[in-house]
């Protein structure tokens, strides 16, 4: 088995990947917010509303298709934003992340487990009772749990990115076509 230093280094790498995902998701949410603000801050909102009104009043097959596609792009943008936000929500329920008898349930590393101690003295006693083998298992458990958290975050980030950018591009294309058609 790897030693403490090796395991701590692996844990640090996993934590860095989680921080990376949080940073990029925050940046993407900011860009999404700025883009939506620009659309509604200038005269684009008037053009969008007049285009939608025109398509609603002049019902034809293509106008109905246009409105349905427009609704889908708005839903895509909203869903993408939801998934980006979801990638930022902390996942701290160890039982949901991994349910294995080998996982350390009373971690001295994981903040949520540490907080279950009623006071500092009880936590300190728990630290003193921890053997080297228990500590290595605790670090290994945290590596596994952090990897699961990281994987879940990046899945949410990736789908949020695709849906929000795809929705924005689709919306821009549809509005351009709707305005000139």
Q: What is the predicted role of each segment?
A:
Residues 1-27, 34, 42-181:
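Cytosol-facing regions at membranes
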